[in-house]
C-alpha cells in the first residue's frame, strides 16, 4: 500500500519495497504509483556493486595465457611476430600483477608500460585495440600531438583519463584496470638537447605531465566530462594499475643507433647501410638502447617508465595483400559483406589485390592507406548499384586499380555484361 490518511487528513506515504513510512526514512522517491526509500536504493546499489565485483573477479580468473593472447592477435593482425610475443607476455604479466598485487608483501612488482616503435600503418594502434577487446577492459586512445601543458591552449593530459572513464560509463574501478594508447609519442620529443628560454609547451613539458600519469598518480577528473572549476567535485582515478602503451614512428632513430655503434667500435655501421629495411628493424630490436631514445628527444625519466619495447617492421607487399584478405575483419571481407547486403557478390582478382598493395606502398601509408584505396575504386559502383537491377556479381581486376576503369558487372542473364569494361 503506497499511502493512507492519518488523523490530520494528511496522506502518509510508504516505501513500496520495505513498507517504511516517509517519517521513518530520510527520503522517499516517487514513481508512477510506486515509492522507494533511500535505504532500499542503497541496498540495491550494494547488490549491483557486488555483482560487478563478482564479474570482474571471474574475468580475472579467465585471464588468457600469453600463447592464447598471441593467437588472438594473429586473427586480427598480420605479421609483426616479435612484437606480438613481446606484447602478449607484457600484458599477461601486467594483469597477473593486478590479480596478485596485494597477496604478497615481500616483492612489489613494477608496472610494465610498453613502447611500440614502427612506421605509419604497421599495426601499432590495431594491436593495442585488439588487446583491450580480448581482455574486455576499457580502452582509450589519445594523440600526443594534441596535448599541451596545463594552462595552455590544447588538450590537458588528464583528458586521457576522462576518455577512459567515458568508455566505461564513469565506473572508476573499471577504468583503473584499463588500457591507454598514446599515438605519435615521437612528436613530443624535446626540440633540442639544450633547454632554452622559450617554453616548449608541446614537447618536454608534455612528457613531464604524462610522466606522472604513466608512473602512477591520482588524477582529478571532472564528472561526466564537465569543465573544471574550483567548486566542482572531481572523480579521483588512481593510474597505478592502468596499462599505458605509447607508439610512434621515430623516423631516423636508426641513425642514432648506427652512430653509437660506430663510435663504440662495434663495426655495425657499414652493414647497416647495406641492409634492407627489414634487416635494419631486426638490428634495431637487438641494439636499441634507452640512450638512443634520450638522444632522439625523450627525457630519461619518460624512457624509464616505458621498460617494454616492441619494434614493428615495415609491411611489405605480401603482408599488405594478406591484410586485405586474411584477418577476421579483413577489408575485402567487409566490402564483400556490404555488397552481399545488396544481393551482389564482390570478387577481387589476385592481380587487383597486388595492385592495391603496390599503390599503398607507393603512398607510404602502410595498411592505413588500404581502405581509402578500396573506397576510391568502389565509390561509383556503391553509388549506382542500389538503383540497378539484375546485377549478381561485381569483379575488380588490376585495370580498375591502375587505370581507374569501372569494375566488371555480371548480370543474372549471363549474356548481359557491362560493356563499359574492356574484355
From Swiss-Prot:
This is ATP-dependent Clp protease ATP-binding subunit ClpX. The gene is clpX. Residues 3-56 form the ClpX-type ZB domain. It comes from the Bacteria. PANTHER family: ATP-DEPENDENT CLP PROTEASE ATP-BINDING SUBUNIT CLPX-LIKE, MITOCHONDRIAL, ATP-DEPENDENT CLP PROTEASE ATP-BINDING SUBUNIT CLPX-LIKE, MITOCHONDRIAL-RELATED. It comes from Acidithiobacillus ferrooxidans (strain ATCC 23270 / DSM 14882 / CIP 104768 / NCIMB 8455). PROSITE patterns: CLPX_ZB. GO terms for molecular function: ATP binding; ATP hydrolysis activity; ATP-dependent protein folding chaperone; protein dimerization activity; unfolded protein binding; zinc ion binding. ATP binds at residues 119-126. Zn(2+) binds at residues 15, 18, 37, 40. GO terms for cellular component: HslUV protease complex. Keywords: ATP-binding, Chaperone, Metal-binding, Nucleotide-binding, Zinc. Component of the ClpX-ClpP complex. Forms a hexameric ring that, in the presence of ATP, binds to fourteen ClpP subunits assembled into a disk-like structure with a central cavity, resembling the structure of eukaryotic proteasomes. GO terms for biological process: cell division; proteolysis involved in protein catabolic process. ATP-dependent specificity component of the Clp protease. It directs the protease to specific substrates. Can perform chaperone functions in the absence of ClpP. Belongs to the ClpX chaperone family. InterPro entries: AAA+_ATPase, ATP-dep_Clp_protease_ClpX, ATPase_AAA_core, Clp_ATPase_C, Clp_protease_ATP-bd_su_ClpX, ClpX_bact, P-loop_NTPase, Znf_CppX_C4.
Amino acid at each position: 500500500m503506497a499511502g493512507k490518511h492519518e488523523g490530520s487528513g494528511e496522506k502518509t506515504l510508504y516505501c513500496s519495497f520495505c513498507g517504511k513510512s516517509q517519517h521513518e526514512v530520510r527520503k522517499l522517491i516517487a514513481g508512477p504509483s510506486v515509492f522507494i526509500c533511500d535505504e532500499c536504493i542503497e541496498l540495491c546499489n550494494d547488490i549491483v556493486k557486488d555483482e560487478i565485483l563478482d564479474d570482474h573477479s571471474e574475468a580475472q580468473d579467465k585471464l588468457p595465457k600469453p600463447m592464447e593472447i598471441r593467437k588472438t592477435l594473429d586473427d586480427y593482425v598480420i605479421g609483426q611476430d616479435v612484437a606480438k610475443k613481446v606484447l602478449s607476455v607484457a600484458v599477461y604479466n601486467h594483469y597477473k600483477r593486478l590479480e596478485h598485487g596485494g597477496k604478497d608483501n615481500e616483492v612489489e612488482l613494477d608496472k610494465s608500460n610498453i613502447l611500440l616503435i614502427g612506421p605509419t600503418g604497421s599495426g601499432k594502434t590495431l594491436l593495442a585495440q585488439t588487446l583491450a577487446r580480448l581482455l574486455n577492459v576499457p580502452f582509450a586512445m589519445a594523440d600526443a600531438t594534441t596535448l599541451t601543458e596545463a594552462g595552455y591552449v590544447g588538450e590537458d593530459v588528464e583528458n586521457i583519463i576522462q576518455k577512459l572513464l567515458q568508455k566505461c560509463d564513469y565506473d572508476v574501478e573499471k577504468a583503473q584496470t584499463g588500457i591507454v594508447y598514446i599515438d605519435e609519442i615521437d612528436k613530443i620529443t624535446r626540440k633540442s638537447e639544450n633547454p632554452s628560454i622559450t617554453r616548449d609547451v608541446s614537447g618536454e613539458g608534455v612528457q613531464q605531465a604524462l610522466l606522472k600519469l604513466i608512473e602512477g598518480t591520482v588524477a582529478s577528473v571532472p564528472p561526466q566530462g564537465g569543465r573544471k572549476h574550483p567548486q566542482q567535485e572531481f572523480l579521483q582515478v588512481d593510474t597505478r594499475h592502468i596499462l599505458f602503451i605509447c607508439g610512434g614512428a621515430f623516423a631516423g632513430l636508426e641513425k642514432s643507433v648506427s652512430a653509437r655503434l660506430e663510435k663504440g667500435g662495434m663495426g655495425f655501421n657499414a652493414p647497416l647501410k647495406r641492409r634492407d629495411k627489414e634487416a635494419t628493424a631486426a638490428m634495431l630490436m637487438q641494439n636499441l638502447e634507452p640512450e638512443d631514445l634520450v638522444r632522439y628527444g625523450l627525457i630519461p625519466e619518460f624512457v624509464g617508465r616505458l621498460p617494454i619495447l616492441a619494434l614493428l617492421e615495415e609491411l611489405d607487399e605480401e603482408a599488405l595483400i594478406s591484410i586485405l584478405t586474411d584477418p577476421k575483419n579483413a577489408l575485402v571481407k567487409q566490402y564483400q559483406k556490404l555488397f552481399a547486403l545488396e544481393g551482389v557478390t564482390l570478387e577481387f582478382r589476385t592481380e587487383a589485390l597486388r595492385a592495391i598493395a603496390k599503390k599503398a606502398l607507393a603512398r607510404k601509408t602502410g595498411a592505413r592507406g588500404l581502405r581509402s584505396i578500396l573506397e576510391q575504386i568502389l565509390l561509383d559502383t556503391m553509388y549506382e548499384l542500389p538503383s540497378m537491377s539484375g546485377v549478381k556479381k561485381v569483379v575488380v581486376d588490376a585495370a580498375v586499380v591502375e587505370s581507374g576503369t569501372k569494375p566488371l558487372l555480371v548480370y543474372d542473364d549471363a549474356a548481359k555484361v557491362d560493356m563499359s569494361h574492356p574484355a
